[in-house]
Amino acid sequence: MALKTFNPTTPSQRQLVIVDRSSLYKGKPVKALTEGLTKSGGRNNLGRITARFIGGGHKRSYRLVDFKRRKFDIEGTVERIEYDPNRTAFIALVTYSDGEQAYIIAPQRLAAGDKVIASEKAVDVKPGNTMPLQYIPVGSIIHNVEMKPGKGGQIARSAGSYAQLVGRDQGMAILRLNSGEQRLVSGVCLASIGAVSNPDHANINDGKAGRTVWRGKRPHNRGVVMNPVDHPHGGGEGRTSGGRHPVTPWGKPTKGKRTRSNKSTDKMIMRSRHQRKK
C-alpha cells in the first residue's frame, strides 16, 4: 500500500498523509461475521469517566476476527482484503472448502485468490498459514502468536508488526519482539507466517484535530495547563514545568515508571525490552 498526499487547498490538507486504500474491497462486511458495537464515551456503568479523552467518532460495526485459527487441515481461499475500523491492520475474508467463512488478520503479500491453511502439523511457510511454533523454521517472520495454547493469538497483531523466531530450547520457542524483548513461548502455541499488513500506518498524519475526533479521540489536555484542583501539575503563575517528576492525575509516577509486576511470567522473558539496545 502506498501513502497518499494532497494538494494543499486548505491548511489541514497540506499536512495530511493517509494510506491509499483504493485496492481494498469497497463493499460492506459479511453480516454474519459482524456484531453491534456500542460507544461508551469512556464511561462505565455508573456514567463516570474511567478512560479520559474518549468520545464521538464514526459509527462502527465490530468484525469478528478469528485469532485462534483452530480450523485445522481445511484449506481456505482468500476472497478479498478489507478495511477494519476497529484495528490498524487490514483483514482478509477467507472461505474454507467446507463453505464456512471467517475473517483473519491479513499479513503482507496476501492477496485475493491465495490459499491459506492452519494445521497442528508442519505446513508450507507462506503468508497466512498457521502452525505450532515447534514446526516453524528458525529465523521465520511470524505474527498473531499465542502465549497460551488454544487462547488465540496475542503477540504481533497490529499494523506492520511481527515477531521473529530466533531459536528453540527444551520445547519452548524463543521469540524476538518488535520492542527488542526476547521471550519464551511454548512450542505448541500457534503462530501465523508473515508480517501484519499495512506497514505504512506508522507514517500517516491526520492533518487536523477533526480527523482525530472522527476516530473517537477527544483533545488531550496536559496536567500542567490545569488548575491545582484538577491535577498535581496544575497551578503556578505563568507557564510552569509542573515542579515535580511526572505523575498521573491521581499522583502515581508516570512517563517511564515501570508498572510490570507479573512475577510468575518473569521467567519467560529472556531479555527485557528495557536493556540497552546493542
UniProtKB/Swiss-Prot annotation:
The keyword Ribosomal protein applies. InterPro entries: NA-bd_OB-fold, Rib_uL2_dom2, Ribosomal_uL2, Ribosomal_uL2_bac/org-type, Ribosomal_uL2_C, Ribosomal_uL2_CS, Ribosomal_uL2_dom3, Ribosomal_uL2_RNA-bd_dom. Part of the 50S ribosomal subunit. Forms a bridge to the 30S subunit in the 70S ribosome. Residues 218-278 are annotated as: Disordered. Keywords: Ribonucleoprotein, Ribosomal protein, RNA-binding, rRNA-binding. This is Large ribosomal subunit protein uL2. HAMAP family: Ribosomal_uL2_B. Gene3D superfamilies: 2.30.30.30, Nucleic acid-binding proteins (2.40.50.140), Ribosomal protein L2, domain 3 (4.10.950.10). The lineage of its organism: Bacteria, Pseudomonadati, Pseudomonadota, Alphaproteobacteria, Hyphomicrobiales. The gene is rplB.
